[in-house]
Amino acid sequence: MFKEFKAFAMRGNVVDMAVGIIIGAAFGAIVKSLVDDVIMPPIGLLLGNVDFSNLFIVLKDGAEVAPPYASVAAAQAAGAVTLNYGLFINAVVSFTIVAFAVFLLIRAINKLKAEEPAAPEVTPEDIVLLREIRDALKK
């Protein structure tokens, strides 16, 4: 059973998939930092110093501290139930960037693939015979 598992795990597809998952996780961390630390702060500044990660709606006040809450973390620490739409906006921007990067990658891979030349069209046998008859009649 161990030999079968080893053969399965060492197949090219499984190893390639594992490498892809690891690189994908690292890429996800880079994109999250790009969105949270580079893209969203200028957008928030343009919209009047809005910190998207702290945009939320209190659905139910916390039992420990009364609203208003300064941040999502403060609201949740107080036991409030929150709808964190700012974090959702950040996630949508992150997803869009990842989806676009994957699109560009797939597009580049498709361009690199050598297009196989189309097989020459085979002339039907009756057409070949008719051409031979025509050529014979011309002589």
From Swiss-Prot:
Q: What is this protein called?
A: Large-conductance mechanosensitive channel
Q: Name one Pfam family in it.
A: MscL
Q: Which UniProt keywords apply?
A: Cell inner membrane, Cell membrane, Ion channel, Ion transport, Membrane, Transmembrane, Transmembrane helix, Transport
Question: Can you tell me which family this protein belongs to?
Answer: Belongs to the MscL family.
User: Where do the TM regions start and end?
Assistant: 14-34, 86-106
Q: How does it assemble?
A: Homopentamer.
What's a single GO CC term here? plasma membrane
**InterPro entries found in the cross-reference section:** Mechanosensitive_channel_CS, MS_channel, MSC/AndL, MscL_channel
For membrane topology, the record states:
Multi-pass membrane protein
Where located?
Cell inner membrane
Q: Respond yes or no to whether keyword Chloroplast is given for this record.
A: no
> MF terms per GO, please?
mechanosensitive monoatomic ion channel activity
Organism, per UniProt?
Methylobacillus flagellatus (strain ATCC 51484 / DSM 6875 / VKM B-1610 / KT)
Q: What does this protein do?
A: Channel that opens in response to stretch forces in the membrane lipid bilayer. May participate in the regulation of osmotic pressure changes within the cell.
